[in-house]
Design a protein with these regions (language model features):
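Non-catalytic, solvent-exposed segments at the cell envelope interface
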Residues: 1-241
């Protein structure tokens, strides 16, 4: 089975006193910043405290720290990682001819500071690379009546999971194995990853072939959180029950 897990970016990380003291010493500005205990800031924390002196399993303080946080908090071992920039995301979607998906609401949002202009109509449609980026990033904007609405990060997370499920279902198949060379080029240009070297890449290709030759199921794992305000900052705190 393929399990898709989307970690809410505002998850609260309760760092140890050792990590906090290191951060206070090496990066007092970050230590004093509100929101540094969100999981989406963990890679920055790892870099600032020079976690494991860049000698961890990935040889990169920020990635090693985030991977160890995920393992400690969620008991999920990170064997490899792939960091995809937005250009790479768009290019990969276009390489496979887009993704057919149902857009649940009118998505209209303009943000000149990010050079982000989202404009999607609701309904079933095939999204190209740029439109797919709009779809997975949208969480607030104008509805069909022209009213501004905040749909929350939870709404965006659900859309991201649906997008990944649709991408896997539509494109992870034998007929697309011929795109491996083009995909490898895109990976080299746009993706930072631990999956390097002929042997490791071959292992993943063989794993892909095995999954294509058998029926497999897709599961979306939901991380149950509760909204919380700590020192005036919004967090998602993981439910313990």
């Amino acid at each position: 089975s393929i399990r898709l897990i989307n970690f809410p970016r505002d998850i609260y990380i309760d760092y140890s006193e050792h990590v906090l003291s290191l951060l206070k010493k090496k990066s007092p500005k970050l230590y004093g910043a509100k929101g540094f205990q969100k999981i989406n800031a963990a890679h920055t924390v790892g870099s600032r405290i020079e976690y494991e002196d860049n000698m961890g399993r990935f040889g990169d303080s920020n990635i090693d720290f985030l991977a160890d946080i995920i393992e400690e908090v969620f008991m999920i071992r990170v064997d490899d990682y792939a960091y995809v920039n937005t250009k790479g995301f768009r290019s990969i979607v276009d390489l496979f001819g887009g993704v057919e998906i149902n857009v649940p609401v009118r998505m209209k949002y303009d943000d000149p500071t990010q050079d982000l202009y989202i404009d999607l109509q609701p309904g079933l449609q095939t999204l190209n690379g740029e439109q797919s980026e709009w779809f997975v990033r949208f969480r607030q904007g104008y509805d069909k009546n022209g009213e501004f609405k905040n749909y929350s990060d939870e709404f965006r997370k659900e859309n991201q999971n649906e997008f990944l499920k649709a991408f896997f279902k539509q494109h992870i198949n034998l007929k697309n194995l011929g795109k491996v060379d083009e995909l490898s080029k895109l990976i080299g240009e746009n993706i930072r990853t631990s999956i390097i070297g002929v042997q490791k890449i071959s292992e993943y290709i063989n794993l892909l072939r095995k999954s294509l030759n058998k029926n497999y199921t897709q599961q979306s794992e939901i991380i149950e959180c509760a909204d919380s305000i700590i020192d005036g900052v919004y967090f998602n705190k993981i439910r313990s029950e």
